[in-house]
Amino acid sequence: MKNILNIAHRGASGDFPENTMIAFKKALENGADGIELDVQLSKDLELVVIHDETLDRTTDGLGYVKDYTYEELLKFDAGYKFSKEFKGEKIPKLEDVLKLFVNNDFILNIELKNSIINYEGLEEKVYKLIEKYNLEDRVVVSSFNHYSIYIFQEDRKSVV
């Protein structure tokens, strides 16, 4: 018998602001087998979880994610545009999301957002963080950029 997995796209994004900690926690609480999330780099090279290259659609900020440090990104509200109820939600770091899922068997699909903007070193940083939390057996890495996946595979080989 095959086991079909329920992966919550950007967390429980139908009911909560996408790619936020509350959306990820609710996906876990609601019985999802895993989540899909999107990763980009901030100006100070922090791995941040946000789908769009710009802040405009999902936050009260404007401009490109890459043009802000993580501390600056924390000033933007990632929940209010979804609903006033979620005012105050922040753009999370990938590390904070991984910490949430270390002590369970949740599956993570990490999409490398490296096609419109080329974030040099994104793949290596993501792999090292996955390895730090011993999540190699529970992570799927995806990207629309086939070269990004190739680089990720090469990073894995250099560590093994």
Spans of model-derived segments:
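Phosphate-group recognition and catalysis centered on beta-loop-alpha active-site segments
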Residues: 1-160
